[in-house]
Amino acid sequence: MSEKVLILGLSKSGIAAAKFAVSKGYDVYVTEKKNEVNLEQVKELQNLGVKIEHGSHSEEFISGASFAITSPGIPPKSEIFRRLNEKNIKIISEVEFAYLNTKTPFIAITGTNGKTTTTALVSHILSKKFSAPVCGNIGVPPTSLIEENHDFLVCEISSYQAQMTEKFKAKIACWTNFTPDHIDWHGGLENYFNAKAKIFLPPQEPEFAILNAQDTKLKEFSKQCQNVIFFDDGNDCGIKNNSIFYKGEEIISLKDCPLVGHHNYQNIMCGIIIAKLVGMNNSDIREQIMSFRAPEHRLEKVREMDGITFFNDSKATNPEASIVAIDSFNNQNVALILGGRDKNTDLTEMCHSINKHIKTVLLIGEATERFEENLKKNGFSNIIKEHTMEDAIDKAISLKPDVVLLSPACASFDMFKSYEHRGEVFKDYVLSK
């Protein structure tokens, strides 16, 4: 009789894990708490022999499972986790399941901000010489790739996914930065840090650990890691004379970098280090960096119109991410669209950045009142409140700034389906003008 595996949720990663598990001969059960499911997907899985339930997590489905594969969105304090733990059923992430079933080396990218851009950039640089697709938290389940023939899997790993690994070992692991986010989910800042730290420490330590030299928490953490290479640092990889250097060799001048802002120079440094570690030459690395385009919704240049440049940074769902975008603009008249569903994060540092770099703030969404109060408390008063994204854009254009920047520092769910939807609404309206 074949081994029973339980898959939690009909997410993209859950569906991919179910298909892969069937191909490996497992008896696959999928349990989805939501009532509404995609009937086509359900039928496709059922035709493969997968048993599916939705609307509840029944005892019949849970009992007898050898292990469970979770979807990233299910919090560890959930009822289903409690029930599985009581039965001593091990819960792993889809990333772990993929790792256990392939010999293809993983390049793991994690961090609070910058990990998606870095993941996409690393894959793009390596594609000159290797087959190295993106996967993980970026929207491509690794189990959908491991039957194919690749040199590397460039995997964006969230704190949720990292926490649910035990044996996962990357060839190279990169930690872009660490700032408070997802604290509710993990139940505290230290838990959030430790979740990410797992994939850098024994028994899961990578061959090489790439860490941010400018992040004090990561600099301290580096003492616990092996084979550390720092970025944004004078010795390993950093900026000198307006160029990025690696081990004393000039790789690319800042003016040739397609991405703006110091945070993006850091992302490029991560890409350079990884490319050098897998044996690429400087001219190929430089050529690939120059041809790279930023992923959507991450300080994405939308258009120039009547002397105004529009940037969509809808992925900035916390103040730290918005600070990074705000600090990218110097000596320009910038109109910033802020707001959305408030995460109740500390706004002090962001207010300081706004004071330095922003001319006008346009507020939308549920966070408006708290953001206005904090901005005024920190000495910024050029604030305009609008009801919709379209109204905010129209008002911003009427001010004739150099830049209109959408970088909300908030979740999107008060007015939009997702940060992607918010970014699309911004772009569509700007492009319709």
Model-derived features with residue positions:
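C-terminal helical cap/extension that packs against the catalytic core
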Residues: 42-43, 348-403
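Nucleotide phosphate-binding/pyrophosphate-handling subdomain across enzymes
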Residues: 4, 14-24, 132, 254-359
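Short beta-strand "acidic-cap" motif of Rossmann-like dinucleotide-binding folds
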Residues: 28-32, 133-134, 154, 230, ...
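Glycine/aspartate-rich loop-and-adjacent alpha/beta segment that forms the canonical ThDP
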Residues: 409-433
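Phosphate-binding loop of NTP-binding sites
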Residues: 3-4, 22-23, 59-65, 72-213, ...
